[in-house]
């Protein structure tokens, strides 16, 4: 099943990479979203904020490490990361939305139980695994014409703040709402060993490229999250770049841009 992009099917747009620190690109993105909203009113943004975290930790002379594409988050750092995601990154996006006339609401994964977050067992510190939650709050906000902007910070049942990978968070929000998903990043989509765009990807092909080391690190996390969403939602997921603003509306409307991931 392909992306439907209708007035009734929500679209979750995951934002990442250097986009969050590029004011011109953000303005172009929200301009495209304004046009898109005329044909599809139910839109949700999900974001991380790794670029802001890297800058903040560097200024504090704190080294940041990753394991298999996921940020290791010591408990002593979770306050800084929460501030970067929920504070800086979220409010930068809200500011652009307000500037372009959107009625925005900034959220975390904990608000209204929109997702269920548990402590990861992968030895990453204060990092959470994210699953679908209660759609009530998001459904009410979308019905009221609001644009939810969700940062990938969660809280588990014990009240612990947890850093959640934004690709995984976006997948969980899609499952909560039975929504379409587009992941925007710095690259055109999934690339092969020759750095050429792969137009279509499925789980078998992904496993081959992961085993060969072609897909690794952050892209491996992204592809696995997209495959999970494609399987659970029974629809295609798109991975594409934010760097071609003139094609963003076409992408959001389901036209052939970037890489299409199917189960």
UniProtKB/Swiss-Prot annotation:
Residues that coordinate or bind substrate: 49-50, 71, 163
Subcellular location: Cytoplasm
EC class (word): transferase
One of the GO BP terms on file: arginine biosynthetic process via ornithine
MF-aspect GO terms: acetylglutamate kinase activity; ATP binding
The entry's keywords: Amino-acid biosynthesis, Arginine biosynthesis, ATP-binding, Cytoplasm, Kinase, Nucleotide-binding, Transferase
GO cellular component entries: cytoplasm
Catalytic activity annotation: N-acetyl-L-glutamate + ATP = N-acetyl-L-glutamyl 5-phosphate + ADP
Pfam families: AA_kinase (PF00696)
Pathway: Amino-acid biosynthesis; L-arginine biosynthesis; N(2)-acetyl-L-ornithine from L-glutamate: step 2/4
EC code(s) of this entry: 2.7.2.8
Site (described: Transition state stabilizer): 14, 222
The keyword Nucleotide-binding is assigned to this record: yes
Main location (coarse class): cytoplasm
InterPro entries to which the protein is assigned, alphabetical: AceGlu_kinase-like_sf, AcgluKinase_fam, ArgB, Asp/Glu/Uridylate_kinase
Protein family membership: Belongs to the acetylglutamate kinase family. ArgB subfamily.
Family matches, as PANTHER family: N-ACETYLGLUTAMATE SYNTHASE, N-ACETYLGLUTAMATE SYNTHASE, MITOCHONDRIAL
Record function comment: Catalyzes the ATP-dependent phosphorylation of N-acetyl-L-glutamate.
Name of this chain's protein: Acetylglutamate kinase
Source organism of the structure: Moritella abyssi
